[in-house]
UniProtKB/Swiss-Prot annotation:
Its EC number is 2.7.7.9. It catalyses: alpha-D-glucose 1-phosphate + UTP + H(+) = UDP-alpha-D-glucose + diphosphate. It comes from the Eukaryota. It is found in: Cytoplasm. Keywords: Cytoplasm, Nucleotidyltransferase, Transferase. CDD domains: UGPase_euk. Plays a central role as a glucosyl donor in cellular metabolic pathways. This is UTP--glucose-1-phosphate uridylyltransferase. SUPFAM superfamilies: Nucleotide-diphospho-sugar transferases (SSF53448). Pfam families: UDPGP.
């Protein structure tokens, strides 16, 4: 694909020029991305021998950060420089929900978005600050989000929404945009990954607005990461040290072997993703001995630096080709990631943060963790229960019967106690009563065609259950 002739890009330009659904900025951004891809600029393999482990100056241990000033006035000054931005482009489809993923209920009837707003409200109340919330939507989530944010109109949090770019999917066969083939619905388009956050902030006018209000840093995080809360120590450090970019990383466990890691490469700090690793080194990349940290996608970025780099068109992140199929037609989506931008910023660092700052909810198994007694909810913050002795969370595998939020919720009369659980694997048609306690290693398997009900108040410790006779 990368060897496609330039002539095809010229033809693509004229095809894209006639797409009335998108702006000139989007057309230009798309053509630039395709041109870079065609000239061979997809994620290149790194030279393995040049990789160096970053020092503590580059990846700073969280415990080594200076304490935050105690004077509330000083804290207010810090917060008045901050903007919180949540990536809100994803739908809840993998969890069986329609609409934006951020409106899935997490706990006590509160959604991801409710918790985010409550957290910032509490900060603003406590310090008299005015930290605003930005939501970067995609064309998939924009309309729903506009309606949803109306309920926060009386909040002390200013909420701004803007859209990330909308790019046409590329038909692989003849290098044409899918929408010009008569695919006029949403399937003809895609949002080009969260690397697009930087140009979209600028193109939407939000960047200049925030700079005019004296804002200096944006804290970017996925809306489904419940651990991504404002951290004053990190903000204070970045302002003191004038770091233009900070990526929060955290120690890798065996569950995170595919996550990107930070390396020192040719004198700069850089994100290394699995796609850039030569085949013979993939196992080494996945090991937790050599690469001990991974990217949480919690990012802190200086707004002036974003403006400078976007205006210079300098953010040329590695391109991630994402092949898809739409109605039998092979298409390509070209995407970029926000974490890969780290190498373009001055004085960029990582901060090695506690695992508590990485609590993503990607599936109902994650929802079970955060809805259980393993966590508590206070003031919008989901915090781990200190009564749990094991520092690691239990591993939870739920079968396809639990995949959708609706069916997951209906299968639990109440969420079991899992404070002392190490691992849980559930498969088949299993239903949980109220007040169930799970401890140690538990496997519950309903035989095909059999409904297995776990009775109220059952205590199951280190057991394999294959039928009612095992209870």
């Amino acid at each position: 694909m990368a060897a496609v002739a330039t002539g095809n890009v010229d033809k693509l330009k004229s095809d894209v020029a006639s797409l009335s659904q998108i702006s000139e900025n989007e057309k230009n951004g798309f053509i630039n991305l395709v041109s870079r891809y065609v000239s061979g600029e997809e994620a290149q393999h790194v030279e393995w021998s040049k990789i160096q482990t970053p020092t503590d100056e580059v990846v700073v241990p969280y415990d080594g950060l200076a304490p935050t000033p105690e004077d509330p006035e000083e804290i207010k000054k810090l917060l008045d420089k901050l903007v919180v931005l949540k990536l809100n482009g994803g739908l809840g489809t993998t969890m069986g929900c329609t609409g934006p993923k951020s409106v899935i209920e997490v706990r006590n009837g509160l959604t991801f978005l409710d918790l985010i707003v409550i957290q910032i409200e509490n900060l603003n109340n406590k310090y008299g600050s005015c930290v605003p919330l930005l939501l970067m939507n995609s064309f998939n989530t924009h309309d729903d989000t506009q309606k949803i944010v109306e309920k926060y109109s009386k909040s002390n949090v200013q909420i701004h929404t803007f859209n990330q770019s909308q790019y046409p999917r590329l038909v692989v066969e003849d290098f044409s945009p899918l929408p010009s083939k008569g695919q006029t619905g949403k399937d003809g388009w895609y949002p080009p990954g969260h690397g697009d956050v930087f140009p979209s902030l600028k193109n939407s006018g939000k960047l200049d607005l925030l700079l005019s209000q004296g804002k200096e840093y944006v804290f970017i995080a996925n809306s489904d990461n419940l651990g991504a809360v404002v951290d004053l120590k990190i903000l204070h450090h970045l302002i003191q040290k004038k770091n233009e970019y900070c990526m929060e990383v955290t120690p890798k466990t065996l569950a995170d072997v595919k996550g990107g890691t930070l390396i020192s490469y040719e004198g700069r700090v850089q994100l290394l993703e699995i796609a850039q690793v030569p085949d013979q080194h993939v196992n080494e990349f996945k090991s937790i001995e050599k690469f001990k940290i991974f990217n949480t996608n919690n990012l802190w970025v200086n707004l002036n630096a974003i403006k400078r780099l976007v205006e210079a068109d300098a953010l040329k992140m590695e391109i991630i080709p994402n092949p898809k199929e739409v109605d039998g037609v092979k298409v390509l989506q070209l995407e970029t990631a926000a974490g890969a931008a780290i190498r373009f910023f001055n004085h960029a660092i990582g901060i090695n943060v506690p695992r508590s700052r990485f609590l993503p909810v990607k599936a109902t198994s994650d929802l079970l963790l955060v809805q259980s007694d393993l966590y508590t909810l206070q003031d919008g913050f989901v915090t781990r229960n200190s009564a749990r002795k094991n520092p690691e969370n239990p591993t939870i595998e739920l079968g396809p019967e639990f995949k959708k939020v609706g069916s997951y919720l209906s299968r639990f009369k109440s969420i079991p106690s899992i404070l002392e659980l190490e691992s849980l694997k559930v498969s088949g048609d299993v239903w949980f009563g109220a007040g169930v306690v799970l401890k140690g290693k538990v496997t519950i398997t309903a035989k095909s065609g059999v409904k297995l009900e776990i009775p109220d108040n059952a205590v199951i410790a280190n057991k394999d259950i294959n039928g009612p006779e095992d209870l």
